[in-house]
């Protein structure tokens, strides 16, 4: 079964919720703008904040570390990251958090590697981003490999407290 979602983290959590509710094994999870119709069965998943919160609470209850890993893993440039993260959650709920100590686990390793790459890029950009002033507003443009802006926001908000600064990703 292929699930199609809106591309948000809550939408991804709703995919996990629906796969458990419908007892379906997923072969792919695609953002709606990336989906190409195929002969395989597919279903569009609606984002429901209550369902997403239930899934996140369950993950946090099992392993707060995995919840953090999921949130950061979702920001990575890992191909098919949704499927890797889905399998990570399935394994967590099935086996418990014990497998998280085995860093060479085939479910865990690709996610850990991608998150390590994300964190390295965030660290690099904290020292690399330069702002230019234009009309009283500080602005910067970056071209990251991962979706780093949510992780950079708190650093630069604390550093530039003038309130009028902008950083955007080049498309």
Task: Cite the ranges covered by each PLM segment.
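Short, hydrophobic/amphipathic alpha-helical patches that form generic packing surfaces
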Residues: 11-22, 87-94, 154-158
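Charged, alpha-helical interface segments at or near domain boundaries
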Residues: 30-124
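Short His-Asn-centered micro-motif
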Residues: 5-7, 140-145, 168
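N-terminal ordered "arm"
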Residues: 1-50
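Hydrophobic, aromatic-enriched interface-forming segments
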Residues: 106-161
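Generic beta-sheet signal
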Residues: 1-3, 138, 165
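Residue-level detector of conserved catalytic or cofactor/ligand-binding positions
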Residues: 162-171
């Amino acid at each position: 079964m292929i699930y199609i979602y809106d591309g948000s983290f809550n939408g991804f959590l709703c995919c996990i919720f629906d796969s458990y509710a419908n007892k379906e094994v997923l072969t792919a999870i695609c953002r709606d703008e990336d989906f190409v119709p195929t002969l395989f069965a597919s279903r569009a998943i609606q984002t429901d904040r209550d369902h997403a919160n239930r899934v996140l609470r369950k993950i946090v209850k099992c392993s707060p570390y995995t919840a953090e890993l999921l949130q950061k893993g979702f920001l990575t440039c890992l191909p098919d990251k949704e499927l890797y993260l889905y399998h990570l959650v399935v394994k967590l709920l099935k086996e418990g958090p014990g497998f998280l100590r085995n860093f060479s686990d085939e479910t865990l390793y690709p996610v850990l590697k991608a998150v390590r790459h994300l964190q390295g890029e965030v660290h690099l950009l904290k020292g690399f981003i330069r702002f230019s002033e234009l009309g009283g507003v500080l602005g910067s443009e970056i071209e990251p490999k991962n979706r780093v802006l949510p992780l950079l926001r708190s650093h630069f908000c604390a550093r530039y407290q003038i309130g009028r600064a902008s950083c955007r990703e080049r498309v």
